[in-house]
From Swiss-Prot:
Its cofactor is heme. Binds 1 heme group covalently. This is Cytochrome f. Its main location: plastid. It is found in: Plastid, Chloroplast thylakoid membrane. It comes from Jasminum nudiflorum.
Amino acid sequence: MQTRKTFSWIKEQIARSISVSLLIYIITRTSISSAYPIFAQQGYENPREATGRIVCANCHLANKPVDVEVPQAVLPDTVFEAVVRIPYDKQLKQVLANGKKGGLNVGAVLILPEGFELAPTDRISPEMKEKIGNLSFQSYRPNKKNILVIGPVPGQKYSEIIFPILSPDPATNKDVHFLKYPIYVGGNRGRGQIYPDGSKSNNTVYNATAAGIVSKIIRKERGGYEISITDPSDGRQVVDIIPPGPELLVSEGESIQFDQPLTSNPNVGGFGQGDAEIVLQDPLRVQGLLFFLASVILAQIFLVLKKKQFEKVQLAEMNF
């Protein structure tokens, strides 16, 4: 009996441990996956400034390319693909928050014209779903369905991101018209250098906050350094804290200048932005164009037939 109770207690403890582990994993994964878009969403009402600059560039300081591809024209109430490409060397490793090296992640923000939005799941074809994979998109704001964000997601798998977009219908939305519209995109690979509060991450270069002699370098137990800089004129000492990740460039006894780099720049990523244009095409205009082309083709056919008939008449008159 005692053995049975003990076995039952062990099973209960194992089940509880598994539940706690799963909960911690879910919470951690959620916080990581939503971190980057939340930085912009919490700090800015609109991700695109009046100057045209996308706010992600405030934290991701290096400039890198990004490309967006959309159809030249779409019909109303149609699902189409917006393809965002974030190219980078897949062999590169970035500095993680704990100072270790790991793969790069990517993220993107897609700013569509008013009325365009993420396509509902039931409107997305199986072929498009296969291209999208396990990506989960979200609106920048509940009232800004035309602005979509994604990331961070593993760059090895998602350096090309497919956004399923639903075009608006002017027949049901009077604020939308059959016009040419701009589309803006921003894409980053790797971690940022600045946090929204203005503090540095460990994915950037650290500079000396004072001039003087490097009097002491203490390597911290969990990584990183404490660098003591002494002013030889008055003996005043300043301590610069270096987090785990960047490589140290100075040594004890070295004379340094104010703002001189103390570390290398570990950043291998960067942010880029681009734009494209799309035409919301009027179906009646397309039908009119098709009718016009058909009439031109028919006119050409009749002209050829008429010419052949005229040649036959001429030939008959010559024989007569």
